């Protein structure tokens, strides 16, 4: 138990340090605030008094004042956006079950395959339940800069029985919303796959009950607060004028306030999970026979199938993070395709140069490396930037699972830190570079690469 507590505390601390490294040092209001001009008040128009007809024996009754302008109707979710988000949610589930489960299952020894499959599936299921109970509320409601509140326990308030309407969640476009219940489901899958990723770091040597206990505690004290700090904000409609921009930004999560860019979870998902997995591997210790016995994957066929399912599902993961079926979703979609392909080629080239030939395991690992690296950048960089990020990530993660792994000395069973940690860090840093408009990114002329990297 002491090791478990130490693991959680150290893991959360390192993850927070990693997040802070990607944050912008100067507070920057969300882009929506920069383009919203203060609403001009319409000048009051006074209708001239009607003159009484000359023949009228008495003055006419005064004309009634114009009716007050009706308040603007609340935005209505677009059916296309809603359908896209439900499909994206399904794709992320597909990434985990069976994608990640098969990817991990093929990498372990045959005697441990069913154990890993069960851990991935049950961990995902546990987190979905905890997300509905309290996780969503802690991550995506207004509280303070580090954690949300309990306003949405058991998703309370997403349905108004009296009015017969669903609550809406903001997107990144002013006046565009999606049903909050769809947003909650989408984010539940992110939380679930993040916790399932950690399983690979200490696979083949941890009791099932201990895995579930660790997962529940880590989710509560690490994932939910970090998701709030990086992703929670008040939405573009809250920035009704420049006068309130500062107040609205102050209500956002701590890392969001600092201007960090994380489109789909490079820090929240990958660096966060990788640090937890690395610390867990240190604390649990090495597998019996590690370094002495062969621990080669038992089925690269399953690993190939799992990697392919991850690639397909990742389109929902990245493009769905736009929260709308729009141009940014399309940009994230093609960047996910391009960066992954580039990383596969880079890993194979690096492996051929290092070992004399490429391998199926290398190609599958390269695909995951590219997917991880493009995650924080997907909707922020141009296609050229995605190509470069993929190539760099392929080589960097190959080093992460070989040279860096030996330097760290931890038995990270399935190279969670080497792929997700290194890939996440590379992606987070290069997002700061290639988001610049001059390099094909979506940021304007006032964007500073240096401040983002710092």
What residues fall within each predicted segment?
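Glycine- and aromatic-enriched membrane alpha-helices
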Residues: 47-48, 52-454
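Soluble extramembrane regions of membrane proteins in the secretory/endomembrane system
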Residues: 2-70
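Short, intrinsically disordered low-complexity segments
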Residues: 1-2, 151
